[in-house]
């Protein structure tokens, strides 16, 4: 609600809403995020937000189908830009996705299969972090969805923490 109600000083301020993990539940059933487009419209900021998502972490990394949502005015503006930049979209890839994903029920079922694969990995990471909890050297999130655990180490330890993770074969996003 706070983001939607922003009153930016700059008239061209834009909220680029990355909704990449909108379907990525690791625990439980699908719970949709609040609709940022509607929240912004209701707050009088319909033209402030551009929302993006894709199927790249659902189907093929780097080869998914991207989507964008915005107000009618912003879509009209962007259509003019994209029309000059893009000759044609990859219609074969779009068709491949439509045939594979089919509908919302099939997408949600696929995401449950993804969650079954990822859940043990999340549990292993969280178990290791819980093991160091008594030391008080870090704090972390325990997400219900998405594909990231955010870990905050003690000040001044980031480089060494990243080096130790790399030695253990764990990839961290600094």
Walk through the language-model features, giving the residues of each.
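Active-site pre-lysine segment of PLP-dependent enzymes
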Residues: 1-61
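Short beta-strand segments
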Residues: 16-19, 53, 67-69, 148-152
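Hydrophobic residues in well-ordered beta-strands that form the structural core
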Residues: 17, 97, 172-174
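Glycine-rich, phosphate-binding/catalytic loops in enzymes
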Residues: 31-35, 68-69, 166-167
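Conserved core segment of the aminotransferase class I/II
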Residues: 41-119
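Conserved C-terminal alpha-helix-loop-beta "cap" of PLP-dependent enzymes
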Residues: 75, 79, 150-174
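Conserved glycine-rich beta-strand-loop-beta hairpin in the small C-terminal domain of fold type I
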Residues: 112-126, 137-152
